[in-house]
């Protein structure tokens, strides 16, 4: 974790130093375009690499009861046998993280009255699903909401979305719920890796780095809007 934190701090320090010596155009215009191009090229390369990789046999990732005898109930969305069922399953997975919704956790009960001793128990755990969903959708809305700085005139649907996001009219400038909820979601995902011993044991630098980087982006955005009150339109 500390290595990831050091890298994120180093990135912030380089950006601050570049701005201090008059390289604002490089860090504010050139590098963002380079980053976007690099991102799309990397995604395309990865997709081509995966497409060329040999797949000797099919590895299903379904769950639940497959289609069998008529009197055995099939899990149609978890283990579909039709194209429509596959489309529904993919939609639920991509848009609602259905596999995380089925997440379970294991624990050891020190004394179980039935076994008269320790017993391993399994229970449903929806926290990861909830905060993962909250994180991704808030991040998406924040990303879309920033399009208003690049459009003139601003589309009506974007203005409407912005008004809904700040519907409570708290503070000046008004508080956007997606920014606050995104911060809460990132802190939960980071705390989950820090305080869960088993998860912390298997976590690598590239597990912490995205969370810390996004946390830095969120905190800097909140600071610019509510504390420093930076005029982004002028920038």
Regions found by a protein language model. Give the residues of each.
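Alpha-helical transmembrane segments
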Residues: 12, 34-45, 141-144, 181-188
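Generic signal for short, ordered secondary-structure residues
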Residues: 26, 69-70, 117, 166
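Membrane-interface amphipathic/juxtamembrane segments adjacent to transmembrane helices
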Residues: 31-99, 108
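Transmembrane alpha-helices
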Residues: 1-24, 29-41
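Juxtamembrane/interface segments at transmembrane-helix termini
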Residues: 21-31, 44-63, 188-205, 223-234
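Structural motif marking the loop-to-transmembrane transition
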Residues: 1-2, 23-30, 80, 84-87, ...
């Amino acid at each position: 974790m500390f290595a990831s934190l050091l890298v994120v701090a180093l990135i912030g320090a380089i950006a601050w130093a570049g701005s201090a010596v008059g390289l604002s155009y490089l860090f504010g215009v050139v590098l963002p375009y380079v980053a976007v191009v690099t991102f799309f090229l990397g995604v395309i390369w990865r997709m081509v690499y995966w497409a060329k990789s040999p797949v000797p046999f099919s590895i299903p990732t379904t769950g639940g009861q497959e289609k069998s005898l008529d009197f055995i109930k099939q899990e149609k969305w978890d283990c579909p046998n039709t194209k429509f069922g596959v489309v529904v399953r993919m939609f639920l997975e991509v848009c609602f993280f259905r596999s995380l919704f089925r997440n379970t956790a294991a624990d050891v009960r020190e004394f179980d009255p039935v076994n008269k001793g320790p017993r391993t128990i399994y229970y449903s755990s929806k926290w990861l699903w909830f905060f993962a969903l909250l994180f991704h959708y808030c991040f998406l809305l924040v990303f879309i909401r920033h399009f208003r700085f690049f459009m003139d005139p601003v589309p009506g649907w974007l203005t409407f979305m912005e008004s809904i996001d700040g519907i409570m009219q708290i503070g000046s400038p008004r508080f956007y719920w997606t920014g606050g909820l995104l911060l809460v979601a990132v802190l939960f995902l980071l705390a989950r890796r820090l305080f869960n011993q088993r998860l912390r044991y298997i976590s690598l630098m590239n597990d912490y780095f995205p969370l810390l980087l996004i946390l830095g982006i969120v905190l800097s955005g909140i600071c610019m809007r509510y504390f420093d009150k930076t005029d982004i339109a002028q920038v």
